[in-house]
Amino acid sequence: ANKELDDLKLKDHYNYNVYQKLTLALNNITADSLRESKLFKQYPFFREQVEYCADIDKNILPLSVDETLTQVVYRKKPESEKHIIKGINSTGVNELFNTGDMLTTVLKDVFQNVNVYEDRVRLLQYPFDSPISDNGIGFYRYYIMDTTYVDKDKCFQLSFVPNNPQDFGFTGTLYILADSTYRLKQCLLNLPKKTDVNFVENMIIHQQFGALPSGEWVQTTDDMLCELNFFGGHFMVRRSTHNSDYSFLETPERVFKKKGKEIKDANAMMRNDEFWSRYRATELTKSESNMGGFVNKLADIKGFKYILFGLKALIENFVET
């Protein structure tokens, strides 16, 4: 594959929007648990919150959903980059206790950005060879599977696995443009379970790339899904990221005079439905949309404060690991 993403930092100015959705859910809700669990029998609204996740072929029960819209702005001379948080929308069980923000921070740390264009990728505190790196040629074995279309682009479909089955590396599929550029159009990466990454059972990474009207080749989609198991609880976390609205026009000077790299807009927490309908790149599922009602019913349960105490302890233990 062509190993070059167009380096936007060669431009004098650029800005673009990053929409991100982070969902935390109970995982692996089986037919037996739906039928036999006292929780689902006693509180039908829990059953109503369960939905199917096609990516892992399991039923899940979403507990919280966090959305952010961030504008990334860059100036070459003098060099400066700012992340302006335009919108924040958070609903779910993390609203009910102080640890919620801490959990979101930890999950975002677990879900670090993976840049496959770098030779070495660091994920879950481990280094991995990228499947399109110079080292990858020796580490992975590649198989040409098919010629297919991604969006409207004709691509070669390549599967890859570590050369040595004992080695800890990605498995997955690359989609390379079937033209003279050989650019990476899409990649699907799977991270197999490793015993000493004690809480991660499975991780799936999906990235997509495309050309801007002005010709630059940029990342448009960066999605990650992780199945976790800690203290006997099965959880799924999904992060959906979409980059859009690229512009190379000059950003007003006043933006770069603000202190700190991350700047929160004064109205970020007060955005209305119209705002989110405009910028939401990944639609909310039925259960995610119903999160507010789910939390209200949860808070009405008799003895809920004891359940909350247990949830808080579980999350604090996870944060410490």
Question: Which residues does each PLM region occupy?
Answer:
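Short helix-loop boundary/capping segments
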Residues: 166, 179-180, 188-191
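Extended lipid/amphipathic-ligand handling interfaces
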Residues: 173-178, 204-213
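Cysteine/selenocysteine-centered motifs that mediate thiol-based redox chemistry or coordinate metal-sulfur cofactors
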Residues: 208-231
